Amino acid sequence: MKATTFTLLLSIATAINAAAFEDSRLKALFARDAEISFGATLSAEISHGFGHHHGHTADLSSEIGGGSSSSSVSESTVEELSTTTTTESVSASVSASVSASVSASVSVSSSAEETSTEATESAETTDSFETTDSAETTDIVETTDSVDTNTTDISTTDETTEETTDATDSVETTFESVSNTEDLSSSSSSIITDSSESTIEETPLITDTSVPSSLSEEYSTSGSSSEWIHTTTAATSHNSSNSNSNHSNVSNTTTSANFAIQYGTDYGVAVVAAIVGALLI
């Protein structure tokens, strides 16, 4: 009877302990999900609820090769955006094509209590140079020299003697199909990509970006030597934006660890008490 009662109480204590562990695990998961959901809701309210009140957008584009530039700025607040672009000409003695594009966009959303500022700038420059020189020389020299010596006869009354001497000297010199071909080809291309993304709160945003926008190349040949001269000049673009913002801190001090410790301790005490009671019986 005592053995049966002890086994029954031990089974009950084991079931209670397993239920307590599962309950504490579920509470910890719920607490973590609640914290994640609270942060996502707050971020959505900041970006969606207050983002449509104020907006500032600027798009800048320029093309150096065609010599054309266009810019459009739309304003709906007191924000100010100043842009200075300096472009220098590109010269190449053989053939060169240079294209560069600069784009900048700034969006500002603000309210009475919370402000979110996001700035994205990207610059891409592509320079390509291709030079092909070919020289072909063909020299053909042909020389033929020949010397022929034929018959000599000597005769007397008593005895006839005939001597024949044949001598042929042939000198032939042939130079043909002497070809000298020189192919000089040079191709160089460079791609410079600079992109930066930043999020700033209650801090004036000042970004200076320097983009190499012009490249000149000269090629000179003297005798049998070749020389390349590369000259790079930089064009400077300044983009500045100022904004005022307020900041508020939200903290949640209750964590999932507190739930696990609190409920785990309570169920552990209950299990120990059940085991001690079974032993006393």
Swiss-Prot record:
Question: What positions belong to the pro-peptide in this record?
Answer: 257-281
The alphabetical list of record keywords is:
Cell membrane, Glycoprotein, GPI-anchor, Lipoprotein, Membrane, Signal
| Signal peptide segment | 1-18
- Subcellular compartments: Cell membrane
Organism, scientific name: Candida albicans (strain SC5314 / ATCC MYA-2876)
Origin, by domain of life? Answer: Eukaryota
Is Cell membrane included in the keywords of this UniProt record? yes
Record's bilayer topology term? Lipid-anchor; GPI-anchor
Which ranges are annotated Low complexity under compositional bias? 69-94, 106-158, 167-203, 210-227
- Locate the coiled-coil region(s) and give their ranges: none
Name the predominant localization: membrane
Q: Name one GO cellular component term.
A: side of membrane
| Keyword set includes Cell membrane | yes
Name what induces it.
Up-regulated upon milbemycins A3 oxim derivative (A3Ox) treatment.
Where are the stretches annotated Disordered?
52-94, 106-227
Name of the molecule in the record: Predicted GPI-anchored protein 39
